[in-house]
Amino acid sequence: MAKIIAFDEEARRGLERGMNQLADAVKVTLGPKGRNVVLEKKWGAPTITNDGVSIAKEIELEDPYEKIGAELVKEVAKKTDDVAGDGTTTATVLAQALVREGLRNVAAGANPMALKRGIEKAVEAVSGALLEQAKDVETKEQIASTASISAADTQIGELIAEAMDKVGKEGVITVEESQTFGLELELTEGMRFDKGYISAYFATDMERMEASLDDPYILIANSKISSVKDLLPLLEKVMQSGKPLLIIAEDVEGEALSTLVVNKIRGTFKSVAVKAPGFGDRRKAMLGDIAILTGGEVISEEVGLKLENASIDLLGRARKVVITKDETTIVDGAGSADQVAGRVNQIRAEIENSDSDYDREKLQERLAKLAGGVAVIKAGAATEVELKERKHRIEDAVRNAKAAVEEGIVAGGGVALIQASSVFEKLELTGDEATGANAVRLALEAPLKQIAVNGGLEGGVIVEKVRNLPVGHGLNAATGEYVDMIAEGIIDPAKVTRSALQNAASIAALFLTTEAVIADKPEKAAAGGAPGGMPGGDMDF
């Protein structure tokens, strides 16, 4: 395919135009008085949102250079959202301000590489200042405040704080759609994995279609079970004890499955068969987790254990197990606390050493299942459009609250960035590096200015006023008053603010040091010709 190439100022200005179109659409959502944006969908109802990354993802521009510029800024929003769950709009506003200021200097003859070095040194200093400003999250109220700001809803914030209080900072908080209106929180202690019963005949409550086993034995096997002959010796021992049995295996099929189902229907023996979660090595690891949690052993030929020779003391125990068609929840496993703690530390070490985001995410899930409980926030709404938007806001707010616990909180509303700019006095830079640092100093004002503008106020005046207030004080844009931000609960996780700045600076440096842009040449749409043997294609019928 043919390419088109632009150089120097033409290349940079093309990228900037694309970035400005995207940033202008996103920045109207910033702050408590930010507006919404409506996104048209190819199918179904349009989506209404004030989430920066959702808006950014929808923007596709026609001009090839502008398209590349918009894609670069999308990356800022996406990266910030992935890391911290919020701050996407702040990151976009910072990137736009940095690029605008930087390109002005490049056009005036500044050396782009020196500007880049100045920007990087300034951002490093400001990031350090933000972490120094950060206060540890100590109370449930602080978690509620930060989640409420992210979700723009105090009820959601309080529910997330309640969930984190119950399951701990490493616990799993999932968001599900509910058929009923409103919000509810469901807590499960112990482990939940997303595999349900193999046959609906195992259900003990036919109305809710779930199976509930009290004080069961738990057989954990890393193999398929199809022959009843292999299973019989163990079944007889469990039947003698009078306890129910949960079987977690790669699969249970054939006569083994039919024997279990027939005995369950006749009421002779209560059991449930469930497929093991995960695949390959991950399945092996998760079965090991379940074994440690329940005090059992994984029956696998790899370790010399065969099903037909297995004794009852290799089985795990739990206070209760609830199984639906989609998931299994093991409550209060009988494993030793020391062994569980050892396994948790082992998984933490694996997370530290892993360089794959996917592996790290899966290890984090395993850690959460072992170390914390599981909290499910069920969200309902009047329409499908509102439900999608609400669910997305809750998911972002959960990540935001976890970020607050991780690195602490700073004053929100763009105030932390303004007050972190005091570090510029200590930076000893010269020439174009100093110019690059100055671009960062000016860009730090952009989020507060935009919040003020969205609230119908004069941005420049507000920035000067806030700069002269005591540390931690700033503008409450919802009321127009100047307050102690942290005391009022107007806070941001330090991780969100830091990530927004670092990602914005990273893209800005790329913009400034770009000397050529190579893009696909737009294809002209071919005029539709007439079918063979027909007269001219533009005839009027």
From Swiss-Prot:
Compartment annotation: Cytoplasm
Enzyme type, top EC level: isomerase
Gene Ontology MF annotations: ATP binding; ATP-dependent protein folding chaperone; isomerase activity; unfolded protein binding
Annotated catalysed reactions: ATP + H2O + a folded polypeptide = ADP + phosphate + an unfolded polypeptide
Enzyme Commission identifier(s): 5.6.1.7
Lineage top rank: taxon: Bacteria
Gene Ontology cellular component terms for the protein in this record: cytoplasm
Pfam families: Cpn60_TCP1
Biological processes per GO annotation: protein refolding
Binding positions (ATP): T29, L30, G31, P32, D86, G87, T88, T89, T90, G413, N476, A477, A478, D492
Functional description taken from the UniProt entry: Together with its co-chaperonin GroES, plays an essential role in assisting protein folding. The GroEL-GroES system forms a nano-cage that allows encapsulation of the non-native substrate proteins and provides a physical environment optimized to promote and accelerate protein folding.
Stated family: Belongs to the chaperonin (HSP60) family.
Alphabetized HAMAP family for the sequence: CH60
Full protein name: Chaperonin GroEL 2
Taxonomic path: Bacteria, Bacillati, Actinomycetota, Actinomycetes, Kitasatosporales
